[in-house]
Amino acid sequence: GSEMCIRDSLITPTDAGIQAAVRAHMAVAAYADPAFPEQSYAGAWMVIEGFEEVDDEFLERIFQRCHGQPWEIARTKRCVIRELSLEDLPALEKLYQKEGVTWRLDADGERIPGFIEPLFAKEKEKKYQQAYITNMYGYYGYGMWLVFDKASGELIGRAGLEHREFPDAVELELGYLIDPDRQGQGLATEVCQAILAFAREELDFPRVNALTDQKNVASVALLQKLGFYYLEDTDVSGSRTQRYIYEFS
């Protein structure tokens, strides 16, 4: 039949099946079966159109999504890349407090340069990340992830793929940050290569963008090493930045 149940995960073509699974606290995905038209699929974590990609990993991911467990995205030689969970916020805060990571204002209100936007105040950041987990990870299956040292389990960075609106289209943008104490070890290259491989294999975009300040020599060198080429200077959020492109040819 068109219903499948493995390890507390159910794939079903009917709203009745979905509601039964929800009541039983099971992870559930809907199968768009033409034999059961006019279903709403309310309560399902995703809707599939066939069983070609359904394997143990797929069912495990439905289970994790339903139970609020972060997905692991990739493993490199030295790192684990995975989704953020709310339990990671204290470690993320610690990383963002390091010198030069985020821009901030000095006593006179002048902007002290840094790499990225600072976090919100604690409760606001928690609400923001909860919505991000639900809406970005849950709906798109990608976003900004966390980078952990494979050996120690320590949080050493943040990297991933976001949407960026350009005048002609919404495209993917690569973002990355490595703990200042761990820079110069080739970790950013390792992590970004894994993310580009993920984008090539899993996502339906022809290319990935990266935005950087031309004064950020290390970032420009990294992008060139990864195979990005310079496209144009552009204005983003009121500041002039360089746009680089990586094509999936």
Model features per residue range: what roles?
Residues 19, 23, 154, 215-231:
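Conserved active-site alpha-helix within GNAT-family acetyltransferase domains
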Residues 43-47, 224, 246-248:
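Short low-complexity, flexible loop/linker segments enriched in glycine and/or proline
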Residues 49-181, 193-202, 207, 211, ...:
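GNAT-family acyltransferases
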